[in-house]
Amino acid sequence: MKYGSYIIEKREYVYIKRLLNISGYDHTLAHKLALEKLKHKIEDAIIVEENEMPLEIIRINSSVKIKCLRNSSVMPLQIVIPMDEDLKKQKFSILSPLPVSLIGYSKGDIVNLTFSKDKEEQYIIEEVKQDTTANIPI
């Protein structure tokens, strides 16, 4: 982990805390586990102001490319607010398991991701781009 800890921008921290307060009623186990992981992640994160936020940190509205270290397959995705989720366009809600696993990491970090039962793979974060035109409804 490049920065030694997860880094989250202050407004996004507030937004995620609000989402967690109203999102505890999801019925799938995977989402319940993701929400719990997100809760712990933001509790352990370094919270910074917008002007202190490194551009290479994965956050809400980031477009990301991750590459599997085993077979070099590349997966592009964007992390969005729940109402903007569109899986056909590779836009994943911040409350989904994959974005929860990636949020707070930076370009060059290696993360362990599980896409199927008990099959964990290592991925490197190859690219992080910020969409500065999208606003978070706080």
Stretches with model-predicted labels:
Residues I125-V128:
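Conserved hydrophobic positions within beta-strands
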Residues M1-P54:
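N-terminal intrinsically disordered, low-complexity, charge/repeat-rich segments that act as generic
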Residues I42-I46, S106, T132:
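Conserved NTP-handling cores and scaffolds of large molecular machines
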